[in-house]
Regions:
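Short, charged beta-turn/beta-strand-edge "cap" motif at the junction between a beta-strand
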Residues: 50-56
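Short glycine/proline-enriched turns and hinge-like loops at secondary-structure junctions
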Residues: 17, 42, 57, 75-77
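Hydrophobic beta-strand signal
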Residues: 48-49, 63
Length: 134
């Protein structure tokens, strides 16, 4: 199993939308590195759900329930989606500032490549963030 972080603008697609809609496709990714990360995802991989822009916090966990397929919103046929399902809301959101303050997380893509919307995490990084949320 691999671990990931997915970023979404809460005014476009929020944690509450994800919970309400149930399993749904993660669409609209238009960056090649993010697309390649989507292609690496496997069924049952876990992803943090990150609210970008105003909140800038990890708020929940989703699970990949369907591996990549063509993004139906992409007219160029270059981009893909995966389907994800909400698993758990974090007890306490973990903010970008908290992540930046943790020396063990200084090299994660959320800090180093802040514009990337789909990024891998190491198991150790995942575990640290889970502890921070409790």
């Amino acid at each position: 199993m691999k671990y990931w972080l997915l970023k979404s603008e809460p005014n476009a697609w929020s944690w509450d939308n994800q919970v309400k809609e149930g399993p749904s496709m993660w669409d609209g990714v238009r960056n090649y590195q993010a697309r390649n990360n989507l292609k690496e995802m496997k069924k049952n991989d876990l992803c943090f759900f990150y609210h970008s822009v105003t909140e800038r916090s990890i708020v929940g966990i989703v699970k990949v329930v369907k591996e990549y397929y063509p993004d139906p919103t992409d007219k160029t046929d270059r981009f893909v989606v995966v389907d994800v399902k909400a698993i758990k809301k974090l007890k306490n959101p973990v903010s970008l500032d908290q992540i930046k303050e943790n020396n063990k997380l200084k090299d994660i893509a959320l800090v180093k490549q802040s514009r990337l919307s789909v990024m891998p995490l190491r198991k150790t990084e995942w575990d640290i963030i889970i502890k921070m949320s409790n």
